[in-house]
Amino acid sequence: MKSTNILIVAALAVAVHINSLAQTNAPVTIAATMPAHVNVALIPVPRTGGITNRQTLVLERAKAAPGDYDIEFIGDSITQGWEFVGKNVWNEFYGNRKVINMGVSGDRTEHVLWRLEQGQLDGIKAKVAVVMIGTNNSGKNKDGTDAYTDSDILEGVIAIVNQIRTRQPDTKILLLGIFPRGRGFNPQRGRLLEINQVLAKLDDGKNIFYLDFGSQYVESDGSISKSIMPDALHPNEAGYKIWANAIEPKLKELLGEK
């Protein structure tokens, strides 16, 4: 498996940080008592509580129906929503294709990594994997600090991409930019925009393809209309129609359809 682009992204991030320190003549020091940062976005962990039922269902769904698929959708509640408010659109666009939904509400990158580790993709051979994950990593702690750094989230998404590439080397990955969130523009949405700019660099035109159509959910004044995202996060049927239309041309290309 080739991971050149992923390594380049990581190297560029480090280089930019070091260069910024050099330009300010700031000394680079490491405090002996400073604990090492642990990126929990990279540590596979299962869900707890009531959502474990959905987690188990998704795992068993894949294991109960191995074989060839046209498309697999991997993500959180926004992906899971295809089965509910997005059901009519799903049937319209994917009813004649063999497609599997692997979305679990509330999932963060570490939860998807756990599912992959548990064999989510074992026995599944998909032509295309549509992946969107990371919005649930972008929240705050109770004290108002970021629960995850931008680098944490990026590394978590990249780890998922690498896992899919390892477990399904013939699968094309359609990585989607994380959807905008919040009724008006806000710092969290700004973070996601910056994260998406880096994720775009993973597109190698061969195995990984990046697509960002989040702007289609945003009005000219920067707001997200209740007519497509009632809670400013999850699409309704009209919002899923935007999603389906946005990725359809690329899906046809990757699936070899006319």
Question: Where are the predicted features?
Answer:
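Proline-centered flexible-loop/turn and helix-kink motifs
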Residues: 95, 169-170, 204
